[in-house]
Each structure stands twice: as C-alpha cells, then as structure tokens.
From Swiss-Prot:
It comes from Neosartorya fischeri (strain ATCC 1020 / DSM 3700 / CBS 544.65 / FGSC A1164 / JCM 1740 / NRRL 181 / WB 181) (Aspergillus fischerianus). This is Probable beta-glucosidase F. It catalyses: Hydrolysis of terminal, non-reducing beta-D-glucosyl residues with release of beta-D-glucose. GO terms for cellular component: extracellular region. Glycans are attached at N69, N77, N261, N332, N364, N399, N425, N478, N728. GO terms for molecular function: beta-glucosidase activity. The keyword Calcium does not apply. Keywords: Carbohydrate metabolism, Cellulose degradation, Glycoprotein, Glycosidase, Hydrolase, Polysaccharide degradation, Secreted, Signal. Belongs to the glycosyl hydrolase 3 family. Pathway: Glycan metabolism; cellulose degradation. GO terms for biological process: cellulose catabolic process. Beta-glucosidases are one of a number of cellulolytic enzymes involved in the degradation of cellulosic biomass. Catalyzes the last step releasing glucose from the inhibitory cellobiose. Its EC number is 3.2.1.21.
C-alpha cells in the first residue's frame, strides 16, 4: 500500500514535467537561453573549477586525492540522485563506498526534519525574521543542525532566502526571513553558520527569482515563467542574500524551478558559471530543486553539479538526464571529463569540509512512512523491506529555543488604552478555530496541506511534523480559570456579554507550495487574497459589535489586510504571532499575560489596500503561453515602494510596539576603513585548482557489475553497451551558443566567497544608547537604514542594512548598541563597470536609526554630525 501510494504521487507529478529526450547525451535541450522582451542571459562558459580559495584548500586536497582514483561510475554516482522515493530521504545520491563515502542523504525542511518523528517543529523563517535577533537566528541553526545530524542527514535543504517577498501573495514567502535583502541575508547567514557548526551541509535556496508558485515548473505544454530581472536589480536585491550566504561558507546552492531572462535556472550559465561560481566565488556544489532539471548536457556545462532527486522530468520509469546518460555523455565526449571531475570534487570537498568523513551517522528514519518497517525503496514496484524508522529522539531541550523565538517574534501592532497585557483574572471570551486544535488530529494533513486549528506553519515541503502542539486554547485555559472558548469561525448568537469582558479573536491567513491546493489556493494566495481565511474579518467585526474590548491575534504567512476592522473603537489591540511552530500556545501566553513584553517587529509592510503595491508584483496566470514576469518595479519592493510613492501603509516595515517605551540617545559614527576610491581595490588572484587527467575513461568503468541485483527505478551510472557509447562522436552535439572550453578572465567583482573581500571591509560603525523609559522590562530593536547620495544615481531613499537587539532592560536601564556596515552596504552595482561603486570616503551618506522604517530616532551624516530626532 505504501509503494502504491508512492507511485501514485509520482504519477501526479507527470502533468507538471517535461518529456525527457530519448538520449539527452546527444539531443539539445528545449530550454536554451534566449532573449525575452529585452532581457537576456548571455552565455558564460566554461564552468569555473572550485578549490582556489585557501579557506577550502584542505578539503579540496582531500577530495582531489579521492577523486583522482575514482572510476567513472563512482563519479557519476555522487552527482545523481537515486530517484524519487528510492531511499529513506527526500533525496539521496549514489555512493562511493571504496572511499568511505555513503549515499548522501538530503532532507527538508528549513524549520525541522520533514516527515520524521521525535524532532522539533521550529517557528518558520518569517517568524525568525520578526525577532530581529541574530543570536536566536544562530541558535535555531545550531539546533536544526544537531537534529538533522542526529537523524543521519548529510544535507539540510535550507535556509530559504528566495522568494524574497516581492509578491505579497506569494505562496512560500513565509519560509524566508522577510521582504528585505539585508534581513534575508542576515537571517540566512546566521542559520547557515549554525547548521554547519554541527557538520551538516546547509543549502541556500531557491536561486533565483522564484517569486510565485503558479507556473513555476515547465511542463509538457508550457514553459515555466521567466523572471525578467535587470542586472542592477538582480545584484542589489535578489542576489544580496545569496552572496551573504556564500560568504558564510554555505556548502550547497539549490536552483529555482523558474527561468530567469528566458533561461532555466538549473542550466543558466550566466547565473551559475559567471555570477555564482566566478563572481561570488562559490566553492560548494549546485543542485536542482526536485525535478527541476530540464536537460542533461546543457545543465552540466552551465554549472550544475548534482541532479535531485535524479529522475528525468517524468519520474515514472527510472529515466534520467544524468545517471547512465551522464556516463554516456562522458564517453562520447559531449561533456568534458574536466567538468565531471569538478562536479564530483565540489561534492566530495564539501563533505570533507563539514567533517562528515568522521563519525557521522547513517539515516535512521524514513520520510516515506511512520511505520517501523517497510520497503527500502518505496518508489519501486517490488522492494526489499526492513527496518526504516528507529525513532531516534533528537529534540533535546530545543523546545526552549523554539518557544523563545515564537515569543520574541510576537509583534504588537496596536495597544489602545494599554489593554495588554491581560490580567489572569480578566473575564475572557475566546473566538476562532485558529485558537484550537486540528479537529482531524495532529499531523492529519500531509505536509500541513490544510488550515485547521491554530496555524503553526504554511504548507508544502518547507514543513515538518509536529511532535506535539500546545494550542492557544490549552495555554490560556492553563493560566485563566475565567475564560470561555468558542472554537468556531462563525460568531455565536448566544454569547453572554458582561461589561468587563475581553474578547480575544483568533484569525489566520495561510499559503504554501504549489503541489498542494488548499481551499482554492494553489500555493499562492489566489482565492483568499490578503484577507483572513475562514470568515476572519467578519468574526472580528461581529465580536467588536458585541464587546467593548477586543484583542485580535493573527497567525499569518505574511501581510494581511485589516481595514475592515482595525479602526473600530472596540478593537483595542492587535498581536501578530506569525507562524510559531509547536510552541504556539505557550509563546503567546508569555506575552498576552505580561510575563514578557513583546519585542517582535514586522518583517514586511502591512498595506491599507492591495492596490497600494505596484501592479507588477501581482500574481500572473496565463495558460499555455510562457509567462513573462518582468520586474519593472526594479529595486522598489515592499517598504521601498511605499516610500518612493509616498504611500502611508497601515503598519510599516519594522513596526512593533512594546509594553514599555525606549529612547535613543548619544548616537556616534566612527570611520573604520577609509574609502579612498569609488571602486574596491583590485581583487586577489585565483589560487590553483585541482588537476586531473582529462582522458576519456575506459568504457568498462561503467559496465554493469557481474551478478548485480538491480532495483527497478533506481538510478545507476551503468550502461548496457558502454563500448558502443564510447564510439559516438561529440561533434554532432549541438552545443549552446557561446560555448567554449577556454576559461574566462576572473571577474573584477570577485576574489573570495561572496565577492571581492574588500567589499566586506567595515567602513563605518554607529553606536547608540537605548534606554528603557517605561515602567516594565523589555527589549528594543535598533534598525539601521542607509540613505545614499544622489551622486550614485537613483536609489531607494532608505535601505535596511543592519539591526541590533538589546538584552532585557529593566525600567531606567540602558544599553549601548554598536552596528557595523561595510563598503558594499553603501554601494550600488555599476552595470557598465560590473563592480560595486561607493561614494568616495562615504561622502553624502546618511545613516538613520529607528524602531521602524517610518519611526526614526537618530541620524548621522558621514563627514558631519549625529543627532537625535
């Protein structure tokens, strides 16, 4: 039954996939690079080799010694997944057991081990972003790394920094950290450092421009949409968090399903070879998203290193673009041996870099079943069976961090008459199914593909099973003996109202990944729009008509419209609890009843109307014809657009109230590095890279081993007629336009992980003293925005570049926060010079400090003075 369900799921993926060519080693892909409405992805070949940075030298030396002695089959094995549902993890490579390299296990999700057991369901990325707390971002990464390692997972498929949140209705915005490149960059980098500190390879995704779910994948009748992005916008907005993730040493990058400038991300040589591997100096390996490979030779030449889960675009019969086809392409010369050597060296070097050649456990769980025993290869019709789940408990005390994140993310938008915090003896009437449990049971919806009970996370591959869930209903009942609960989305007609009652109304808004449609929403928020689900707006209005004191609690994936009820006199307070994970109830009551003061801040803007956004960020839907999603708004998404257009939102980016108040004083600005030139100093030269023989291997290296027991649909590197494959000539292969094997000169903007190391010289430091001027303890967030001079051309008037959060300050207590920012932080991308340009000596730069993008408390001018506003 488990096998049949797995096959059925595979079959369901077929309509959203391209037909695989009969022999990709000799047939050009359908998705070559070409112009779209003036946007293009110029070819960039060959793929740069990894290993030229000193920080990776030891790992590459070890990898070189191993790869030099590998057979062709062993090399191909490590670059190709074994097939969908063909192992315990959502993806696994083949192995090279002669060298101690096992099948590498790759597993979702960014908030916890997906489809597993005895794991922590942490708050989602958007919740982490709302904390504006770097320490919590890092701590979550550490504990995720511990749990993934404990389950025997080599590669953690996260964090997600794309989508960036360009489209407020976008289905997967909640997996990332917020609608700003610096917030995404800091959240992503801190997560990566934490995960990899535990020896697990992190994967930054989805590279790049995957800003809506609908039409993201190519299928038989329609190509995936093309995100058409100009060079400056790409660098300053969408690439920014990826660059910081690479600077943090991330081991893997996952490509997006969509195209960029009419070239599929998984075979876009401009994105992979030039920008990622050359300009940004990425030393790890590039993998596809699942079934996001659209060609074999073309993707290898364009810089792809690993195909996941290995299958071709129709994952039914065990066909693949790589696997045996890659062996074929090497033997006939279509793919140079040097390219395969670099592919596998990058993978093995990353394995060594994380120390996984030591005491690293094998997978002890199955993402295919919760049963103790079952098929070892569920995607095969006939599979050997055995123990697949050992139920290893990896939770430790991680619930403490999960609760702290969920609590510190809670964002107080409104608190008229200081109605919050509630008193324990207040008479409470609690409304809304979002306060209660899922009536069908915990984890009853696969990949959280429903919105029933309290909303803890969105849906899709970015989820994990809940080990337990404390609902708001349970937590409130545990604290208050004077609370009545109405777990319904229709306001009851028979509710008795007393003069001292406080109505607490729970509403939610959900979204997720495109392969699941929930209540008419195919991932993106199409049906519900930006409104609350389940009659939420009416529920608030009905409560406000009956009660004089209403508190609204919102669990949401992103911006939510509030105009129908936010100004009603009875609506006294609004809390956004985001997506809290397993500690939904306890984290909320910590704040609701005043044990902690709220310290979260909005990681996006809440508009007054959806029409406040630029029209270009709406969802696009067009059957059959390829969608051209042209980013005409350029750099101006979210708060940048609102500032440029002088639109006052309902609540601005960064907004968040407290139960206390804070003052900012004594701002100072100090110079750390003199910026004597507009462009960074000359980049350091590339170091040497591993070298190997480039002779085409003996065909016998991919012959089937004798007496080999094949598993149907398992993807192997072997060929039935390897000698025949070697006879084919590469001259007939239609290489992409611009293809060459002659290396390009090193780009001037490169030189290290993330780019020219001079870009990350600390240019200035700003300090400010924050004082608790209220009557309750609390934590404050100082947000640093830069305003660049007109000499650099048109730029957003304010751009978040740093933030810092105080410790808990008692009334009257102070803390001095210091924030550093780099040359790159005050630079723009020069599309002509192809480098980052800053104002000489930082002249004309203003640094704004505040508690939101519209609540500035101090300003400093480079070359001038600082003052309190």
């Amino acid at each position: 039954m488990r096998v049949l369900s797995a096959i059925a799921l595979v079959a369901s993926l077929v309509p959203s996939a391209l037909s695989a060519p009969a022999s990709e080693s000799r047939v050009s892909t359908q998705l070559q690079s070409r112009d779209a409405a003036g946007y293009s992805s110029p070819p960039y070949y060959p793929a740069p080799n990894g290993g030229w940075l000193s920080s990776w030298a030891d790992a590459y030396e070890k990898a070189q010694r191993v790869v030099r002695n590998m057979t062709l089959a062993e090399k191909v094995n490590l670059t190709t997944g074994t097939g969908i549902f063909m192992g315990p993890c959502v993806g696994q490579t083949g192995s090279a057991l002669r060298f101690g390299i096992p099948n590498l296990c790759l597993q979702d999700s960014p908030l916890g081990v997906r489809n597993s057991d005895h794991n922590t369901a942490f708050p989602a990325g958007i919740t982490v972003g709302a904390t504006f707390d770097k320490d919590l971002m890092y701590a979550r990464g550490v504990e995720l790394g511990e749990e993934f390692r404990g389950k025997g997972i080599n590669v953690f498929l996260g964090p997600s920094v794309g989508p960036i949140g360009r489209k407020p209705r976008g289905g997967r915005n909640w997996e990332g950290f917020g609608a700003d490149p610096s917030l995404q960059a800091i959240g992503g980098a801190q997560t990566i450092k934490g995960i990899q500190s535990r020896g697990v390879i992190a994967t930054i995704k989805h590279y790049i421009g995957n800003e809506q779910e609908m039409y993201r994948m190519s299928n038989i009748g329609q190509r995936a949409y093309s995100s058409n992005i100009d060079d400056r916008t790409l660098h300053e907005l969408y690439l920014w968090p990826f660059a910081e993730g690479i600077r943090a040493g991330v081991g893997a990058v996952m490509t997006a399903y969509n195209e960029v400038n009419s070239s599929a991300c998984s075979q876009n040589s401009k994105l992979l070879n030039e920008i990622l591997k050359d300009e940004l100096g990425f030393q790890g390996f590039v993998m596809t998203d699942w079934l996001g490979q659209y060609g074999g030779v073309s993707s290898a030449l364009a810089g792809l290193d690993m195909a996941m889960p290995g299958d071709g675009a129709i994952p039914l019969l065990g066909n693949a673009y790589w696997g045996s086809e890659l062996s074929h392409s090497i033997l006939n010369g279509s793919v140079p041996v040097s390219r395969l050597n670099d592919m596998v060296t990058r993978i093995v070097a990353t394995w060594y870099k994380m120390g996984q050649d030591g005491d690293f456990p094998l997978p002890n769980f199955s993402s295919n079943t919760q049963d103790a025993t079952g098929p070892l290869y569920p995607g095969a019709l006939f599979s050997p069976s055995g123990v697949v789940n050992q139920y290893v408990n990896v939770q430790a005390d991680h619930n403490i961090t999960a609760r702290a994140i969920a609590r510190d993310a809670i964002t107080l938008l409104k608190n008229d008459d200081n109605i919050l915090p509630l008193k324990r003896n207040d008479s409470l009437k609690v409304f809304g199914t979002d306060a209660g449990p899922n009536p069908d049971g915990l984890n009853s919806c696969a990949d959280m593909g429903c919105n029933k009970g309290v909303l803890t996370m969105g849906w899709g591959s970015g989820t994990s099973r809940l080990p337990y869930l404390v609902t708001p209903q349970e937590a409130i009942a545990n604290i208050s003996s004077n609370a009545a609960f109405f777990i319904t989305d229709n306001f009851p007609s028979n509710v008795a109202v007393s003069s001292g009652d406080v109505a607490v109304v729970f509403i939610s808004a959900d979204s997720g990944e495109n392969y699941i449609t929930v209540e008419g929403n195919p991932g993106d928020r199409t049906s519900a729009g930006l409104n609350a689900w389940h009659n939420g707006d009416k529920l608030v209005k009905d409560a406000a008509a009956k009660f004089s004191k209403v508190v609204v609690v919102v669990h949401t994936v992103g911006p939510i419209l509030m105009e129908e009820w936010i100004d009603l006199p009875s609506v006294k307070a609004v809390l956004v609890a985001h997506l809290p994970g397993q500690e939904a109830g306890w984290s909320l009551t910590d704040v609701l009843f005043g044990d902690y003061s709220p310290s979260g801040h909005l990681p996006y803007t809440i508009p007054r109307a959806e029409s406040d956004y630029p029209s270009s960020v709406g969802l696009l839907s067009q059957p059959i014809v390829q969608i051209q999603d042209t980013h005409t708004e350029g750099l101006y998404i979210d708060y940048r657009h609102f500032l440029k257009s002088s639109i006052t939102p309902r609540y601005p980016f960064g907004h968040g109230l407290s139960y206390t108040t804070f003052s900012f004083s004594q701002p100072t600005l100090s110079v750390r590095t003199a910026l004597d030139s507009a462009y960074p100093p000359t980049r350091p030269p590339k170091g040497p890279t591993p070298t190997y023989p480039t002779t085409i291997p003996n065909p016998s290296e991919v012959a089937w081993p004798k007496n080999f027991d094949r598993i149907w649909r398992y993807l192997y590197p072997y060929l039935d007629d390897p000698a025949g494959a070697a006879k084919n000539s590469s001259k007939t292969y239609p290489y992409p336009a611009g293809y060459t094997t002659v290396p390009k000169p090193a780009p001037r903007a490169g030189g290290a992980e993330g780019g020219n190391p001079a870009l990350f010289d600390v240019a200035f430091a700003v300090s400010v003293t924050v004082t608790n001027t209220g009557t309750r303890p609390g934590r404050a967030v100082a947000q640093l925005y830069v305003e660049l001079p007109d000499s650099l051309g048109e730029t957003p008037s304010r751009q978040l570049r740093q933030f810092a959060k105080t410790k808990t300050l008692a009334p009257g207590a102070s803390e001095t926060l210091t924030m550093e920012f780099t040359r790159k932080d005050i630079s723009v991308w020069d599309v002509v010079v192809q480098d980052w340009k800053a104002p000489v000596r930082g002249e004309g730069v203003k640094i704004w400090l505040g508690e939101s993008v519209l609540d500035m408390r101090a300003v400093c001018e480079v070359g001038g003075a600082c003052r309190v506003i």
